[in-house]
Amino acid sequence: MIEVNADRFLQSLHELRSFGASGHGKGVVRPAFIPDELAARDWVGSKITEAGLTLAMDAMGNQFGIAPGGGLLLGSHTDSQPEGGWLDGALGVMAGLEVARAAREGGGPPVSVVNFQDEEGRFGVTTGSAVWSGHLPADTADTLTDKSGHSLGEVRQVLADRVTGPVDPAQFCGYIEMHIEQGPYLDTSEDRIGVVSNIVGIRDMRVTLTGEQNHAGTTPMQYRKDVFQGLSAFNTQLNERFRNVVQPSTVWTIGHVSLSPNASSIVPGRVTFSMQWRDSETDRLARMETIIRQTLDDIAEERGLQVECGPMLGLEPVAMDKGLIDALAGAADQQAVGWRHMPSGALHDATNVSLHMPAGMVFVPSIDGKSHCFEEDTDEADLVTGLKVLADAASRYMAVTS
């Protein structure tokens, strides 16, 4: 059994949130590659060295603390949404680091830690782990741009002096990611632990509708080619057409809307928006894509608009490894807390890592189900329970694999 230091873990976790502190509660502003995110990554690096692990970083900015022999890999990410919470990703990195450190101190099995870069999608979808796993070619990733038009290939050069070289996934025997649930199910129940059974698949593309910019006061409604009206009609029709295709856990979101010229006295002539959908079944994701594209075409024809769909990004649904599920379930039983098997509706780095090794995830409750906001929080007792489950599961898994 790996004996973790809960006080040391909590102190480090709180110290990490000082990097990019929003000034609103415990929230953070730490998107990938901004100065506060880089400072946080350097600080994590100092903690990795302090723990007696070998510090490494690949060209994409993924940061590793490697134990002799590699062993079991734990971790997540420390970048945040533009308005993010203090635990999303950071919890998995600091919990993983504490378990790795405690394992070394106690002569336990080899445990390593990873802090992936750009999980939150400044440039794509779980970009750092996607490149590390080979799911996303590095040269393709380098062409991705953020909202300001900066390319990943350009921006990541800020970490060039920290890069030590490629990190071989083959040295690790498995991966566990501890994370907040980011939803209401654990918080509204007696269960304190969620053992993840699978991670949903995701599809994401950028859509542009082009109409005709004109005077808002003198253009009759019947002559308008108003792209905002087109977007509104698309949303309404899409919800109706999805009704007999989706299941209760299916979700879809229109976001990241950019209206041009975005002025009160001009009929808008162009709108670009993101279209994202998630489900646990690949076939349903494909059916939803067909409906989305057909609905866009129908709206464009009805309203005299042009439609353009950008490249499709996304990941397939992924089942978690049975051996890791069993280890986490046994650890939850040992802690004598209520727990449940549950899917993950959010995307995580574990999806990419599963391409190379067995992957598992464990959730702790999110207060009021809130995440991706400054109000994101989890009771400290639940954080410590999750840490102990993670440590116990690591011991159990390594006992049967080493």
Residue ranges and their predicted role:
Residues 15-22, 75-76, 338-389, 397:
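Zn-dependent metallopeptidase/amidohydrolase metal-coordination segment
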Residues 2-34, 117:
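N-terminal capping segment at the start of a domain
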Residues 51, 59, 63-87:
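Catalytic-core environment of secreted peptidases
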Residues 79, 118-282:
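Midchain, well-structured core segments that form catalytic/ion-binding scaffolds
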